[in-house]
Swiss-Prot record:
Residues 375-544 form the tr-type G domain. Belongs to the TRAFAC class translation factor GTPase superfamily. Classic translation factor GTPase family. IF-2 subfamily. This is Translation initiation factor IF-2. Pfam families: EF-G_D2 (PF22042), GTP_EFTU (PF00009), IF-2 (PF11987), IF2_N (PF04760).
Length: 896
């Protein structure tokens, strides 16, 4: 029977009772099995059919013990061929009908069906009817069933399908922990609708059987298992059917939808409130930041926009907007100068203080506890004019011969020594007295406690003596005057005291506060008195330092030592320096690899006021740079990187900018000569002194440009730099070129000059610069001629017959025509003849004929002065010292 292609499908659901239900009666009586066949015939509206009884067995109807129940259902006229609407009876009517036709189930333990069993069957049937009534499908859900659809993964008899009713047979399924038997039970009643694909296939065979391979049982009876296989467990009801979706009321749906919308709106409101609260907090923070702008900030000559905003507690975008209003397009990482930063800060009522490189990256140190302070040795600096006996005095104190190691007998390095006296240790710093070492003397005065001013009794006060006094006063340190060379016959101590008193150094015996000591370094006179005076002054100063904190000090000198690398001479001012300490010296960082004292002995630690040499620097610091130990090497490297970055920015600002105005000035003034120099020295202090001395030689016509200056030997890179930069001159001060550099210099024809005394280097460079200058042209009178007669020659003009009074007359020389003591014409000789022949020159006492260019008014008795133009070498001192023009910065306006 084709279900899909008929309008009146007859659905027959058959179930076979299981063998477990066919138990023998105990009384020996036999009951015939009864089978209930339910036929549902669907007719159109208004028509009816009589109930028909049919038997599937070979024996006929009533003889086989069957009961036939006919149920008539009407279908609506509007039903489609593939759809059936089922009109269910009321629960009470169905219950009565079930009571009439319900069979009595057999009990295994009883021979005949008892009233109690019958009552149980009625009760179970009633429960099934109630469940069916509760879960009956609506017409809309029945109409939507597609009988042709097949589910590929659903086997026949799968009771997990949705919409399956609970009025089915009970199979004897095994009771195992893994599941309820090996298969689903058969179906006792026919299904009205909601067939799955597997159920439709099981019914389409036209047999009354379950959806598995077992035979269907009667209504309410369990069916047989497939192929008469017994179950492993007792009888057990089938699995509960899946619930049929019940149509919800619109009111309930609307309530739930309203509740869901309300929850969504509540979430949105909460999110909006959260973001509004967050925005308010941000605005409050911004207002707080605006109110927390400091009254004063410290910056360097340049600062990035982000760093300035951080110092002012502002956003970088706000400052960028201000700069855009000023016509400057910058980014947050771009640097601006101090003037621009000052203008920006003034808009927020904030003052700007410009600090140095090291103040910007200062390492904060802890304050000293007075209980931890201990006495330290004094640091004494010996200063004075050159050749006044400073180093000789120190040699006499140290009982050594230091000056013999200096070239030219003058000190060109700052030396630091520790001397043990009967009153304790004293640290001496010996500074150069030559005028080229001004910076060295200034640094010596900064790191000292007492200044010993050495003045020669025979020379008196000299320019460097006055300079040393000024350095000591700037450093605010006391001065002890040591009058040296008092053993000389021409020594005049009173003259020295008088001159120094005029400069503000009044002797104690004259009522002042300056101590004077007369000494003789050559004969070692008065040295003990000098040491006692130093110790007395140190006792008055009460010099103390902390020995337990991180070491701090100053770099006195630095150099590159072959085999040891960068060597820095430092003096410890506070704390204790130990091997392995990470530190920062200037813009470079490092770790102390070794410590040496002033005698070259390796030591483990250095205490305050002790001068030492240390190894382990990454680069060579400048003399006078601060030295400080950090807590870790990482901190030292961070500070070093920051200082190097700021140093590079400062150097880039110092580069001269080529502007259109500068170009016009250069064209107008003519080409300026330039001598390029590379300076290499043994120590950084000497290199600095030589560089400053050479740069002072520049004039308006020639300029000396130091393109590179550093300590160390002359290497290949120096030669290549000189060759690439217009054959610059290399000056080596107390250093020599390496063999490779010397060979490369010969190939590239680079001039290398080596010096051991600084003033010799300055003199030779001055001569080289003078040789580059164009010579001066001067007039020199070489002869005097008297005009005794004149002749007119056609096409030539007037010729003067002359007599040479003195000197000589040369062809093409200049001539001045003097008449009555007045120069009436200045010109050039056009012709010179001796009789009729041309002559190159005519000596005194001879006659000659002279013609003058463009001049025919020559007369008798005129005097002719013969002039020769000669070249005279120029001196740098003849011209005004060069003053570098001010560089106009971009963005500045000039008054017109």
């Amino acid at each position: 029977m084709d279900i899909e292609n008929t309008n009146k499908p007859d659905v027959i659901l058959n179930k076979k009772s299981s063998k477990a239900a066919d138990s023998k009666p105990e009384s020996g009586k036999t009951d015939s099995k009864r089978k209930v066949v339910v036929k549902v015939s669907k007719t159109s509206a208004g028509k009816s059919k009589k109930p028909e009884s049919s038997s599937e067995e070979s024996s006929g109807g009533k003889a086989s013990g069957k009961q036939v129940i006919s149920v008539k259902k009407a279908s609506s006229q509007s039903s489609k061929p593939a759809e059936a609407s089922v009109k269910e009876k009321k629960p009470d009517e169905r219950l009565e009908e079930t009571k009439k036709t319900a069979p009595r189930f057999e009990d295994k333990k009883s021979d005949a069906p008892s009233a109690q069993n019958e009552k149980r069957s009625f009760d179970s049937a009633k429960k099934e009817e109630k469940q069916t009534e509760r879960k009956k499908p609506t017409p809309s859900s029945i109409d939507s069933i597609d009988f042709a659809s097949k589910r590929p993964n659903v086997k026949a008899g799968n009771l997990a399908d949705s919409g399956r009713r609970n009025n089915r047979g009970q199979g004897n399924r095994p009771q195992r922990p893994g599941g309820q038997g090996q298969g689903q039970p058969g179906q006792g009643r026919r299904r009205e609708s909601n067939f799955s694909g597997a159920q439709a296939r099981a019914y389409s065979d036209g047999k009354k059987q379950g959806f598995r391979t077992g035979q269907g049982g009667q209504q309410g009876r369990p069916g047989d298992r497939p192929q008469n296989r017994p179950g492993f467990g007792g009888p057990r009801p089938g699995a509960a059917p899946a619930p049929i979706p019940v149509e919800k009321n619109k009111a309930q749906t609307n309530k739930k939808a309203h509740k869901a919308k309300k929850e969504i709106y509540n979430k949105k409101n909460k999110e909006e409130e959260f973001f509004e609260e967050r925005l308010l907090n941000q605005k409050k923070k911004q207002k707080e930041k605006i109110h927390n702008i400091p009254k004063q900030i410290e910056i360097m000559e340049s600062i990035s926009v982000s760093e300035l905003a951080k110092k002012m507690n502002l956003k970088a975008s706000e400052l960028i907007g201000k700069l855009m209003g000023m016509g400057m397009m910058v980014t947050m990482n771009q640097s601006i100068d101090a003037d621009t930063a000052t203008i920006l800060a003034s808009e927020y009522d904030c003052d700007v203080k410009i600090v140095s490189l090291y103040d910007e990256t200062v390492i904060e140190s802890k304050e000293d506890d007075l209980s931890e302070l201990q006495p330290r040795p004094p640091v004494v600096t010996i200063m004075g004019h050159v050749d006044h006996g400073k180093t000789k005095t120190l040699d006499a104190i140290r009982s050594s011969n230091v000056i013999a190691g200096e070239f030219g007998g003058i000190t060109q390095h700052i030396g630091a020594y520790t001397v043990n006296t009967h009153g304790g240790k004293i640290t001496f710093l010996d500074t150069p007295g030559h005028e080229a070492f001004t910076m060295m003397r200034a640094r010596g005065a900064e790191i000292t406690d007492i200044v010993v001013l050495v003045v020669a009794a025979d020379d008196g006060v000299m320019p460097q003596t006055i300079e040393a006094i000024n350095h000591a006063r700037d450093a605010k340190v006391p001065i002890i005057v040591a009058v040296n060379k008092v053993d000389k016959p021409e020594a005049n101590v009173d003259k020295v005291k008088t001159r120094l008193s005029e400069l503000g150094l009044m002797p104690e015996e004259w009522g002042g506060d300056t101590m004077f000591v007369e000494i003789s370094a050559l004969k070692k006179l008065g040295l003990d008195n000098l040491l006692d005076t130093i110790l007395l002054q140190a006792e008055v100063l009460e010099l103390k330092a902390n020995y337990t904190c991180n070491a701090e000090g100053k770099v006195i000198e630095s150099r590159i030592d072959h085999g040891r690398g960068v060597v820095a001479t430092i003096i410890v001012q506070r704390g204790t320096l130990r091997t392995g300490d990470p530190y920062v010296a200037g813009i470079y960082s490092g770790r102390v690899r070794a410590i040496f004292n002033d005698r070259g002995e390796k030591i483990d630690e250095a205490t305050p006021s002790m001068p030492v040499e240390i190894l382990g620097l990454e680069g060579m610091p400048n003399a006078g740079d601060p030295f400080q130990v950090t807590d870790s090497e990482r901190i030292a490297r961070q500070i070093s990187d920051k200082r190097q970055e700021l140093k590079r920015f400062e150097d880039s600002r110092n580069v001269k900018k080529v502007t259109l105005d500068n170009l016009y000035e250069t064209i107008h003034d003519g080409e300026i000569l330039e001598l390029k120099v590379i300076i290499k020295g043994d120590v950084q202090g000497s290199v600095e002194a030589l560089k400053q001395s050479l740069e002072k030689l520049s004039t308006p016509e020639i300029r000396l440009n130091v393109i590179h200056a550093s300590a160390g030997a002359i290497n290949d890179s120096d030669v290549m730099l000189a060759a690439a930069d217009s054959n610059a001159l290399i000056i080596g001060f107390n250093v020599r070129p390496t063999p490779q550099a010397k060979l490369l210099a010969d190939q590239e024809k680079v001039d290398i000059r080596k010096y051991t005394v600084i003033y010799k280097a300055v003199e030779e460079i001055q001569l080289a610069m003078e040789g580059m200058l164009s010579p001066d042209i001067k007039e020199q009178v070489i002869g005097m001629v008297e005009v005794r007669n004149t002749f007119k020659v056609p096409k030539i003009g007037k010729i003067a017959g002359c007599y040479v009074l003195e000197g000589v007359v040369k062809r093409n020389c200049a001539v001045h025509v003097i008449r009555d003591g007045i120069v009436v014409h200045s010109g050039k000789l056009s012709s010179l003849k001796r009789f009729k022949d041309d002559a190159k020159e005519v000596a005194a006492g001879f006659e000659c004929g002279i013609g003058i260019e463009d001049f025919n008014d020559i007369q008798v008795d005129d005097q002719l002065e013969i002039i020769e133009m000669i070249q005279v070498a120029r001196k740098l001192s003849d011209s005004e010292k060069y003053k570098a023009p001010e560089i106009k910065e971009e963005g500045t306006e000039t008054d017109e």
